C-alpha cells in the first residue's frame, strides 16, 4: 500500500538526507519575506517581514516562527505537501507565524509559503473551529491516507488538547500497535503541536 515505501530491513540505516544548502535557504528566505508591491499590508506586518528579511541575510537571531516557515518552505520546495490545522494557525496563537497576510484595502490574502516555486507542493494552513476532538480525528485520518504529507494539528493552547483526549488514547497512541489486528489503524507521520 501507500506505506510500503517507508519500510526498511531490520538493521539497515534509516537516516535520510535532510540538509539544505545555504544558497537555497537564502533564496527561500527571500521569497518568504517578500510581499507583492501592490499589496497593502499592515505596517506592523511590514516591520515583522523586514526583521525576518534581516534574519535571513545575516543568519543571526532566527526565531522559532521563522525557522518553522523555513522548514515548511524547504519541504514544499522538495515536493512534500504541508497541512497545518488549528484554531489560529494562519496568524499563530501568539501572533508569531503570519503565514497568511491580509490586504488592508481589499481584504485579499497572500501566503508567502504558496509562492516559493512554480513546482512546489501544496500548502494548506487552516483556521479550524473550536472542536478539538473532531478536528484532530479528521487530521489523524487524513495523515493515514497521505503519508508523503507533513500533517500537523496545533492545539491553540496546550490544555486545549484535553478536548481531543479520546482521539489520542484510542487512535493515535494505540494505532501502530493495533495495526496488525485492526484494518483501519496504521502508521502516521502526523505531528501534534
Question: What name fits each language-model region?
Answer:
Residues 1-193:
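Flexible, glycine-rich loop/tail regions that form catalytic "lids" or insertion modules at the edges
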Amino acid at each position: 500500500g501507500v506505506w510500503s515505501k517507508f519500510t526498511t530491513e531490520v538493521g539497515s540505516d534509516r537516516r535520510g538526507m535532510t540538509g539544505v544548502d545555504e544558497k537555497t535557504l537564502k533564496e527561500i528566505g527571500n521569497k518568504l519575506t517578500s510581499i507583492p508591491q501592490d499589496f497593502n499590508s499592515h505596517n506592523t506586518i511590514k516591520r515583522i517581514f523586514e526583521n525576518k528579511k534581516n534574519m535571513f541575510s545575516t543568519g543571526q537571531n532566527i526565531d522559532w516562527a521563522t525557522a518553522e516557515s523555513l522548514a515548511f518552505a524547504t519541504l514544499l520546495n522538495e515536493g512534500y505537501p504541508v497541512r497545518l490545522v488549528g484554531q489560529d494557525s494562519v496568524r499563530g496563537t501568539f501572533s508569531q507565524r503570519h503565514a497568511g497576510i491580509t490586504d488592508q484595502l481589499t481584504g485579499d490574502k497572500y501566503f508567502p509559503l504558496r509562492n516559493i516555486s512554480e513546482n512546489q507542493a501544496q500548502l494548506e494552513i487552516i483556521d479550524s473551529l473550536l472542536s478539538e476532538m473532531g478536528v484532530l480525528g479528521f487530521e489523524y485520518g487524513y495523515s493515514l491516507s497521505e503519508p508523503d504529507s507533513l500533517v500537523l494539528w496545533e492545539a491553540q493552547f496546550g490544555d486545549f488538547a484535553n478536548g481531543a483526549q479520546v482521539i489520542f488514547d484510542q487512535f493515535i497512541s494505540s494505532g501502530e500497535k493495533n495495526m496488525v489486528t485492526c484494518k483501519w489503524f496504521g502508521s502516521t507521520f502526523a505531528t501534534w503541536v
